[in-house]
């Protein structure tokens, strides 16, 4: 079963990958990225600070600061 966090991060990864693909295609004269570029974009999307920030804001239970405030163990 998919959890909220897993489902949201999957969609964000796909959106970031598509955004990177389109950006790369326009920069290279509408040539799709090579396999190496596509893998690089996947890695970058997976470790995107935007994804981490959005996940932390969307799911406060994953935020250590909020867990500390509510007295839960980290």
UniProtKB/Swiss-Prot annotation:
Keywords, alphabetical: Plasmid
Region called Disordered, residue ranges: 26-45
Protein name: Protein sok
Originating species: Escherichia coli
Gene: sok
